[in-house]
Swiss-Prot record:
Component of the Nup107-160 subcomplex of the nuclear pore complex (NPC). The Nup107-160 subcomplex is required for the assembly of a functional NPC. The Nup107-160 subcomplex is also required for normal kinetochore microtubule attachment, mitotic progression and chromosome segregation. This subunit plays a role in recruitment of the Nup107-160 subcomplex to the kinetochore. The gene is seh1l-b. This is Nucleoporin SEH1-B. Belongs to the WD repeat SEC13 family. Transmembrane segments: none annotated. It is found in: Chromosome, Centromere, Kinetochore; Nucleus, Nuclear pore complex; Lysosome membrane. GO terms for cellular component: GATOR2 complex; kinetochore; lysosomal membrane; nuclear pore outer ring; Seh1-associated complex. One of its GO terms (molecular function) is structural molecule activity. Component of the Nup107-160 subcomplex of the nuclear pore complex (NPC). The Nup107-160 subcomplex includes NUP160, NUP133, NUP107, NUP98, NUP85, NUP43, NUP37, SEH1 and SEC13. Component of the GATOR2 subcomplex, composed of MIOS, SEC13, SEH1L, WDR24 and WDR59. The GATOR2 complex interacts with CASTOR1 and CASTOR2; the interaction is negatively regulated by arginine. The GATOR2 complex interacts with SESN1, SESN2 and SESN3; the interaction is negatively regulated by amino acids. It comes from the Eukaryota. InterPro entries: G-protein_beta_WD-40_rep, Sec13/Seh1_fam, WD40/YVTN_repeat-like_dom_sf, WD40_repeat_dom_sf, WD40_rpt. The GATOR2 complex is negatively regulated by the upstream amino acid sensors CASTOR1 and SESN2, which sequester the GATOR2 complex in absence of amino acids. In the presence of abundant amino acids, GATOR2 is released from CASTOR1 and SESN2 and activated. WD repeats lie at residues 10-49, 55-96, 111-152, 160-210, 217-258, 276-315.
């Protein structure tokens, strides 16, 4: 059974994002109070705030961890039109701060002219790369050519999406059969604009990102988007948080059916669509195997979704904002799966305060 622990975050305004590190033992939160806090889990499983600092001059929308292979590195993005990269430094043995850690700003990315609404590190097999998206509809991809020098980042790609961007997700697949891919969601409120999820794929020939797909069935504002971890699947699974929860599969068509040397074409299917939240859905997050999806909405609940052996998705559990299960929703369903979902689940639980974001 999942055990809920309430954390007094002590932010002075709305918490917009919660992010766990690779091992699930560190957590970062960000808020409209312009600060980021880092939390560490102790041996008794309690969370303690080990760092808190003012990061931006506006609301901080998102915070994300780099893979630990690159050190203890965070990125944040803000209404102040910037993204920032932070690194944790531990005092040297001859330092009066011996053994104590503090976070240092390594760079500020200032290319956007509007609010930077999301920031995500690329999968580690791509090297130390970072993507941002902005309200002006531009996705920017940066690279740190020297992973030992995080003050130097070069802008590698600019992708114009033509719609205001609210969220991005890298495809985590490390298979050589899959080119690097990034999904972009738009929170444009115009009901006349269809296709508020766009998929961009890296083309080795042109060395640029090109639009591979537009999910035309998504016409409502998108708040979050997440590719599922790909453990040997030949297709991709994408979750979308909008006025409901949607799960899509993207099956690559054979190369001879795609344009020669061009982007991959996909056969897309909506495999699940749930309006159980009866409200806006703000966050979606997968467990590490890509088999359980957690979603959080303005109804104050986190809902867990899983497919059965027939690939039919259904709700397998509901948690209220205080972490308690609703009714007997978990009984006899989970076995060990809930533990594997807990990181994404906690992420969603804490993300329920995201309603009303995008204001300074």
């Amino acid at each position: 059974m999942f055990v809920a622990r309430s954390i007094a975050a002590d932010h002075k305004d709305l918490i917009h994002d919660v992010s766990f590190d690779f091992h699930g033992r560190r957590m970062a939160t960000c808020s409209s109070d312009q600060s980021v806090k880092v939390w560490d889990k102790s041996e008794n499983v309690n969370w303690h705030c080990t760092a808190s600092w003012k990061t931006h001059s506006g609301s901080v929308w998102r915070v994300t961890w780099a893979h630990p292979e690159f050190g203890q590195v965070l990125a944040s993005c803000s209404f102040d039109r910037t993204a920032a990269v932070w690194e944790e430094i531990v005092g040297e043995s001859n330092d009066k701060l011996r053994g104590q850690s503090h976070w240092v700003k390594r760079t500020t990315l200032v290319d956007s002219r509007t609010s930077v609404t999301d920031v995500k590190f690329a999968p580690k097999h791509m090297g130390l790369m970072l993507a941002t998206c902005s309200a002006d509809g531009v996705v920017r991809i940066y690279e740190a050519p020297d992973v030992m020098n995080l003050s130097q980042w070069s802008l590698q790609h600019e992708i114009s999406c033509k719609l205001s961007c609210s969220c991005i997700s890298w495809n985590p697949s490390s298979s050589r059969a899959h080119s690097p891919m990034i999904a972009v969601g738009s929170d444009d409120s115009s009901p006349n604009i269809m296709g508020k999820v766009q998929i961009y794929e890296y083309n080795e020939n042109t060395r640029k990102y090109a639009k591979a797909e537009t999910l035309m069935s998504v016409s409502d504002p998108v708040h979050d988007i997440a590719f599922a971890p790909n453990l040997g699947r030949s297709f991709h699974i994408l979750a979308v948080a909008t006025k409901d929860v949607r799960i899509f599969t993207m099956k690559p068509l054979r190369k001879e059916l795609s344009s020669s040397g061009g982007v991959t074409k996909f056969e897309n299917h909506t495999v699940a669509q749930f309006d159980n939240h009866n409200s806006q859905v703000w966050r979606v997050s997968w467990n590490i195997t890509g088999t359980v999806l957690a979603s959080s909405g303005d109804d104050g609940t986190v809902r867990l979704w899983k497919a059965n052996y027939m690939d039919n998705w259904k709700c397998i559990g509901v948690l209220k904002g205080d972490g308690n299960p609703v009714g007997n929703s978990f009984q006899g369903i989970f076995g060990s799966s809930i533990g594997s979902a807990s990181h994404g689940l906690q992420n969603s639980v804490n993300g329920t305060s995201t309603s009303g974001r995008k204001h300074s």
